[in-house]
A protein has these predicted regions:
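Conserved P-loop
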Residues: 2-119
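A general structural signal for short secondary-structure junctions and capping/turn motifs
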Residues: 3, 28, 98-101, 189-192, ...
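C-terminal regions of RecA-like/P-loop NTPase motor modules
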Residues: 3-11, 255-335
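Short glycine-/polar-rich loops that comprise or flank the Walker A/P-loop
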Residues: 36-39, 193-196, 235-239
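A structural signal for short, well-ordered beta-strand segments and their strand-loop junctions
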Residues: 42-44, 107-111, 197-202, 240-242
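Surface-exposed intrinsically disordered loops and tails
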Residues: 85-98, 142-159, 253-256, 291-297
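P-loop NTPase motor core
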Residues: 112-231
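Phosphate-binding/switch region of NTP-binding enzymes
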Residues: 198-295
Length: 335
């Protein structure tokens, strides 16, 4: 392995499930450990933990899952500020403030942006839907509230003893703004962590051109509690990379006839800038952004398996930036 990571990584990988977001992050954790000997911390809110199991078993990373912890806003803000589980092996261990040990942490992976926003919006204690279920009004909208009991048709109130009385809530429009603004703040807070590498992952979402005051075309970007931030959340990160699987034809040997036949397979691509669907059948723009590179920087990096292209991306990124720097320092001959 050759060294290829920049001095600072603060990037977002987004795409549909199975396109390689977590695989990219896992390979970066491996690369970081190879280059620096430092371990990484994984902040997990979905089922992606299994992707990192070999890193956990090897002691190269440790993980904290947040999706069942109460008070989502407080939990996420603390994790983005360097708080960590007192005992990472205990899924219910309390979070404690950072100590000097944090300086030995080389990287953070937040899995991820979309599930963290859904966690804020959700029904766990402290989540916005939970608050609505308790009757708490946030903003101009009335709380969406469901109580598991029979309702008195005259008063509209639950009949005592007619059901368990469990309260559930939903999300009125005001909740989306609260979740979006706080997620941006949490992402920005994480940038201050004293680690060389900070990576966020996200799922895909498509914007709503009819309601978007600035972007009047269909845009696919990272999902953050609704659609308002889909077209511009990438401005928070250094690089925003889109992962997509694309159908391709390959020649294989038929097991029964022994003949060479065409078969459909998948090419896994890591897109570095805005692009359209590879099939050419959809006029939808997928957001991507790589900063500080030459004009001839590749539009995408292909691989045969999810996540394999990520180190190629960072290696070419380093070469491209070195070329730009050299062009500035090399005198131009006069004619």
């Amino acid at each position: 392995m050759t060294n290829c990571l920049p001095t600072k990584v603060f990037d977002c990988f987004y795409g549909q499930p199975g396109t390689g977001k977590s695989e990219c992050a896992a390979r970066l954790v491996e690369q970081l450990y190879h280059e620096t000997g430092k371990k990484s911390r994984l902040v997990i809110g979905d089922g992606s933990l299994l992707t990192y199991q070999h890193l956990l078993d090897a002691g190269v990373a440790e993980a904290v899952s947040f999706q069942w912890r109460i008070w989502p806003l407080d939990t996420l803000q603390k994790l983005a500020s360097g708080w960590w589980a007192k005992d990472p092996s205990d899924p219910n261990s309390e979070l404690v403030p950072p100590t000097a040990e944090i300086l030995q942490v080389g990287g953070y992976v937040f899995e991820g942006l979309s599930v963290a926003a859904a966690y804020i919006m959700g029904n766990i204690k402290g989540g916005l839907a939970w608050r609505a279920g308790q009757g708490e009004k946030l903003g101009q909208d009335s709380p969406i509230r469901v109580i598991e009991a029979d309702m008195d048709p005259k008063t509209g109130q639950p009949i005592l003893g007619s059901g368990p009385g469990t309260k559930f809530g939903g999300n009125p429009p005001a909740h989306y703004n609260i979740a979006q603004r706080n997620m941006v703040g949490i992402i920005q807070q994480s940038q201050g962590l004293p680690a060389r590498m900070i990576v966020w992952t996200a799922h895909e979402a498509i914007n709503d051109p009819e309601r978007d005051a600035l972007v009047k075309e269909q845009i696919v970007g990272p999902e953050v509690a609704g659609k308002a931030l889909t077209a511009n959340i990438q401005r928070v990160f250094q690089n925003t990379l889109h992962l997509q699987s694309v159908a391709k034809r390959v020649k294989v040997d038929d097991a029964f006839t022994g003949r060479r036949v065409d078969e459909l397979d998948l090419d896994y691509r890591l897109y570095t800038r805005d692009h359209f669907n590879a099939s050419g059948t959809l006029m939808v723009r997928y957001k991507g952004c790589t900063r500080g590179v030459a004009e001839d920087f590749p539009q995408f990096f292909p691989s045969a398996a999810p996540g394999q292209a990520v180190l190629d991306f960072y290696a070419v990124l380093a070469t491209s930036r070195q070329a730009k720097q050299q062009a500035l320092t090399t005198p131009t001959p006069r004619t």
